[in-house]
Amino acid sequence: MPPMKRFICLLLVAAASVSGTHAQRVTRDIPYATPHERQVLDVYAPAGAKSLPVVFWIHGGGWQTGDKTMVALKPKTFMDAGFVFVSINHRLLPTVEMGAITRDVASALGWVHRNIAAHGGDPARLLVMGHSSGDQLAALMCTDDRYAKAEGFPLTIIKGCVPVDADTFDIPAIIEMAETRARVHHLPLPTYGHRQKFGDDPAKHRDFSAVTHVARDKGIPPFLILHIAGHPDTTAQARRLAAVLQAAGISAKVVAGRETTHSSINDNIGAANDPVTKELFAFVADALKK
């Protein structure tokens, strides 16, 4: 069996394992920025870990709720496969504005780059992933290199990006679609929808959109964009981001989860025989070759 196929098979076997045999440890509530109860992260690592690739996970919750403990099978799945897994919290709307949230995520990435070696991770091999609102943040961190530069690390340490079912890679487009739909169907507009969450300013809407920042020769990593097959908005946004990435010469694959929901496509990552998990680990194996 060729070495890369063997590596993918080993990853998939580990991902499907329900009960790992290796000792694992978790270090919780590590501050990554100024003292705020939300500016903390958890590090999950196999015992004796050394220079392992790192999965950096951002929870969902509409930027208003959610927690770093919302990880389901992921920590064990990735540790069993030979990864360090990091899950972060960030401050939330409406207590802070969106820019504070994006800076929190960048600060957490900076902390990982500077400190993850002490936890057995390789600071030069990160995979950035997130669900729902977390994948808008993940995609932005992987395309807008101002965040990496502000934290003092090159974008090239991020070897892959995996957004899981979001509709906000192109924020002006989703705002227009949602508001047009409301007008056509005579529905009330939300009082705190995407327009308001992202600052009620078209310039900010563009700036918080991953598609705005895609360009050649920035070190943008390959993308695996996961979405549920049954939702037109996340489907359209996944295809939009992939098209922009591919036009810039950046590898991007879109995978639609069949018979899944917004919650289950996320919660089932790591489950035995989950098709999305198989796609994910095949992508990871390929991304880490580069």
Name what the model sees in each region.
Residues 7-16:
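Sec-dependent N-terminal signal peptides
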Residues 1-7:
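Positively charged n-region of N-terminal signal peptides that target proteins for export
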Residues 19:
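Cytochrome P450 heme-binding "Cys pocket" and the immediately downstream C-terminal segment
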Residues 4, 23-24:
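Absolute protein N-terminus
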Residues 15-16, 24-290:
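Alpha/beta-hydrolase superfamily serine-hydrolase fold, recognizing
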